Amino acid sequence: MSAIEMKLDAELRTETGRGASRRLRRAKRVPAIMYGGHQEPQAITLNLLQLDRLMQEEAFYSQILTVNLDGKSEQVIVKDLQRHPFKPLVEHVDLQRVVAGEKVHTSVPVHFVNEDKAPGIKAGGIIHHDLNEIEIACLPKDLPEYLEVDVSALELGSAIHLSDVPLPAGVEIPELVQGADHDHPVVSIHASRKAKADEDEAAEGEEGEEGAED
């Protein structure tokens, strides 16, 4: 778990529009909205420096955060970050309230372990991370910080799919409910381009020899 407390101090936002957003940025504030949880949406602002610090943590994007507003605390998850198209700026943050007894749908990062032990890697293959995060559904109390995928047994030309990913108790992958076509690969090992070219060249050579014999 992250050693940094996942907490944001918020203020109610009374002004809207582009001009108001520019004034907020000058005041080191970021516009945001907090919605869900059977309550009305609230337009708020967040402390830019505090937000920047938390955004350095992987857990910020997948874990439950505490928002302090007017002396009250709200539990939320980050649903969207709107970034400036070419400047390193966050222009708006969407936060969804979390209710203890209701499932949340969010994406968590995937941590790949034991890649150097994979037979496919030892055979000269190239590993490809098809998915770096996976959407899950669970109660807030069961929300994992990440999912771990062990690739130590992965062979050349094979893949680990969503259905192969070990899940903590109470966690499910909604994509799998939609059928086998949605059982996407998470990580795979393919032959390198050079190895593939060598194989193709060898195959062509064998075909040429067979033709000469005929």
UniProtKB/Swiss-Prot annotation:
GO function terms (MF aspect): 5S rRNA binding; structural constituent of ribosome
Transmembrane segments: none
UniProt keyword terms in alphabetical order: Ribonucleoprotein, Ribosomal protein, RNA-binding, rRNA-binding
Region feature (Disordered): 189-214
Gene Ontology CC terms: cytosolic large ribosomal subunit
Compositionally biased intervals (Acidic residues): 198-214
Record flagged with keyword Ribonucleoprotein: yes
Coiled-coil ranges from the UniProt annotation: none
One GO-annotated biological process of the protein: translation
HAMAP family for the chain: Ribosomal_bL25 (MF_01336), Ribosomal_bL25_CTC (MF_01334)
Record note on quaternary structure: Part of the 50S ribosomal subunit; part of the 5S rRNA/L5/L18/L25 subcomplex. Contacts the 5S rRNA. Binds to the 5S rRNA independently of L5 and L18.
Family recorded in the similarity comment: Belongs to the bacterial ribosomal protein bL25 family. CTC subfamily.
Record's protein name: Large ribosomal subunit protein bL25
Gene for this chain: rplY
